């Protein structure tokens, strides 16, 4: 036996008290004990992961702020850009800009620090602002699709007036503010004890009643239906009919080749709109649905990292929208260039073509009262 066994009686129970040695403490022999291996490692605390997250969020913020600000600027500055469709696009840009400036910086900070250091006011405000902006964006995307469907499929010459468009925009914000209000009301800013004598400041949902999880699940599923499934169905239906109408339409006259090209460009843009909207939000919504169905998903080792990655993918739509609705349109391209050159006026890029079709309309109305011009005007933004 060793030295300890030699000094102790065989039938005597020896109680040995072991004192833990933390980092920086030495053993009786003056040695530093090895750091204990943690049972659960948060990947978002790794330096290389944090660098990637910072680059990703900063890129989204930069592209979103520049792109959305530019869209808003050209719609306000140039009179020829002040159309109903462009007002809706500018409203979409405002909502995305709200996410880029108010939500994403604090979301990044919360992810990197692991606790909420921004105080109780922002604890209630940031989630509400993000929910508000996302719902405004979704409603605006749906309104744009329905407006384009109304103009192109049904050849309606009398478009929505500017006054009505502002009313629709106001209703979109009002409805969204109401739908997002639970995110601000049922919120709690509190201290959470992770381990004894170690607390963190958290900003979490706090639903009323004994069955708190039920209320949260109902709201989450309702949001999924209202913000994703229903709008995606409406948008897909509208753009499918628009694409079919554009594909089957034949433009008579000398400018038919021009509108044949614009037809394919518009079809491509509309398909991109639906794909980006569906793909960017699908992972986050699917993951949230999995959490609602099975709460054990919260216990996943990399839950925080998975959620963050899906959130980044969803937020990519905030800078993709200006590209899809703005940069792929020739009028917006010219407006962007004029803004960079500090030009004070912007001539309509399709003015000559529009005049040609207006002249053709006068002749065609006399002959067969055809709807060609209403269709051609509807294809211009």
Swiss-Prot record:
Gene Ontology CC entries for this record: cilium; glutamatergic synapse; non-motile cilium; plasma membrane; presynapse
InterPro entries: GPCR_Rhodpsn (IPR000276), GPCR_Rhodpsn_7TM (IPR017452), NPY2_rcpt (IPR001358), NPY_rcpt (IPR000611)
Cytoplasmic side: 73-86, 146-165, 238-268, 326-381
Membrane side Extracellular: residue ranges: 1-51, 108-124, 187-216, 290-304
General function of this protein: Receptor for neuropeptide Y and peptide YY.
GO biological process terms on file: adenylate cyclase-inhibiting G protein-coupled receptor signaling pathway; behavioral fear response; cardiac left ventricle morphogenesis; G protein-coupled receptor signaling pathway; negative regulation of cAMP/PKA signal transduction; negative regulation of excitatory postsynaptic potential; negative regulation of feeding behavior; negative regulation of nervous system process
Listed name of the protein: Neuropeptide Y receptor type 2
Region annotation Disordered: where it falls in the sequence: 1-37
Record membrane topology: Multi-pass membrane protein
Family: Belongs to the G-protein coupled receptor 1 family.
Source organism superkingdom: Eukaryota
Organism field: Mus musculus (Mouse)
Localization of this protein: Cell membrane
